[in-house]
C-alpha cells in the first residue's frame, strides 16, 4: 500500500480543453488520471476526478471550510471517520473541516464529482431567506 503525499499527488497542470477551471495530471507513481477543478465566485468549487490507482492507496486530509457533496460514479474502497464503503453511485456529504481518510483499491477507476459550498455563503444565504420568510409569515398571519 502507498500513502498519498498531497505535495506530490499532482505533477502538472495540463492544457484545459474548455475555458473554465484547471486540469491536473496525477503523479504516475500513484496511477493515471486527472482532476478538473473550477471555482465559482469563491462560493463553490466543482471538481471532477477520473483516476486509476496502481496499488492500494491511502488518502488522508481534512475537508476544507465548506460542505462537500460527492457523487462517486465508480470506484472501490473504504472511508474512515465514520466507516463507509465506496462503491458506484455512492452519494456522500462531508462537513466542514471533517477529518478524511480513505483507501482506494487499484485498477478500478475512481470517478467522482464533488461540489464544495463555502460555509460563509450558506450562512449568509440562510440569513437572507430567513428574513424573507419571517416577513412573508408575518404578512400571511396579518391577512388571516
Where are these regions (language model features)?
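Short Lys/Arg-enriched alpha/beta "domain-start" segment
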Residues: 1-15
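OB/S1-fold single-stranded nucleic-acid-binding modules
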Residues: 18-24
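N-terminal regulatory/effector-sensing and dimerization cores
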Residues: 25-137
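Conserved small/polar residues in nucleotide/adenosyl-binding loops
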Residues: 139-144
Amino acid at each position: 500500500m502507498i500513502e498519498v503525499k498531497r505535495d506530490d499527488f499532482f505533477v502538472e497542470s495540463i492544457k484545459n480543453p474548455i475555458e473554465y477551471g484547471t486540469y491536473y495530471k496525477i503523479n504516475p507513481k500513484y496511477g493515471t488520471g486527472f482532476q478538473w477543478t473550477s471555482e465559482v465566485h469563491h462560493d463553490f468549487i466543482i471538481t471532477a476526478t477520473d483516476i486509476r490507482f496502481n496499488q492500494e492507496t491511502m488518502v488522508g486530509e481534512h475537508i476544507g471550510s465548506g460542505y462537500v457533496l460527492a457523487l462517486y460514479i465508480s470506484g472501490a474502497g473504504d472511508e474512515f471517520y465514520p466507516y463507509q464503503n465506496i462503491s458506484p453511485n455512492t452519494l456522500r456529504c462531508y462537513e466542514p473541516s471533517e477529518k478524511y481518510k480513505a483507501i482506494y483499491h487499484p485498477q478500478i477507476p475512481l470517478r467522482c464529482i464533488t461540489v464544495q459550498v463555502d460555509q460563509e455563503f450558506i450562512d449568509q444565504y440562510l440569513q437572507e431567506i430567513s428574513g424573507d420568510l419571517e416577513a412573508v409569515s408575518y404578512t400571511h398571519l396579518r391577512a388571516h
